């Protein structure tokens, strides 16, 4: 296989995470990186042996030896940088969420389609052991007729910056576009829509909240203006319904895991239990399907992100 040469735009927290995965993919080489922070760019590029470094991502896009770029920037920058990359004749792998608004997301998709370029959004939950097994069970008819899905995940205290981790850029609308729903919710919603067969949406309602106390100094210094809690209800044209609960902070114990309800059985997924799929009332077929799907590589922490990258490549 010919060597695939790519560039990475943004070497912050997410960019470093992606670079760690790239070194394990044979036939791939990161030849260029771009970031406004030149000191950090130099440090990261030296660590990963990236020869070409740019403070202006447009210079990176001028390289004709790069076939694809990985966009690892703040949410509201995804659209302009992705579209610029597509216009520069590059395929794009972009960190989630796709964009800060539906309008921007649609512009990205239209640019990719009109240019016949691949646009892949990092949604690692679509590649987990739980998702693959659940999809197998659903497609086999083991759970019967689907009628409801639950997309949920919340932390007792896990607000970026104000609760002690991450930067303030996660909690500023002008940079991140949204809070828990954009940061965590996209993973669970994408997973649920996939399991339900990507149904046509009829109506969506929802509400966002910012109710819990936080350190006043951190609130002031961060400019915190996004939601910590979001809830929604989705009606589909075929009668399916989905409820959504996402929270960075809530006065309940931490919990994460979506569920699917059918006329013959139900499936609950919990990624923090390392590929233990909870299945109720499905019987022998379900047990056999789960056992058949298990593989040592699937159990590795971060394997879902690796599969997402490999899928793009």
Give the residues covered by each predicted segment.
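Contiguous beta-strand/loop segments that form the cofactor/metal-binding neighborhood of enzyme cores
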Residues: 190-281
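C-terminal helical cap and adjacent loop that interface with cofactors, partners, or active-site loops
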Residues: 254, 258-261, 268, 283-313
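Predominantly a Rossmann-like dinucleotide-binding segment in NAD(P)-dependent oxidoreductases
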Residues: 118, 125-224
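Acidic-histidine catalytic/liganding microenvironments
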Residues: 25, 48, 63-64, 128, ...
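N-terminal Rossmann-like dinucleotide-binding module
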Residues: 1-48
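Beta-loop-alpha module in the N-terminal Rossmann-like domain of NAD(P)-dependent dehydrogenases
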Residues: 18, 48-111
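Hydrophobic residues in well-ordered beta-strands that form the structural core
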Residues: 54, 94, 119-121, 244, ...
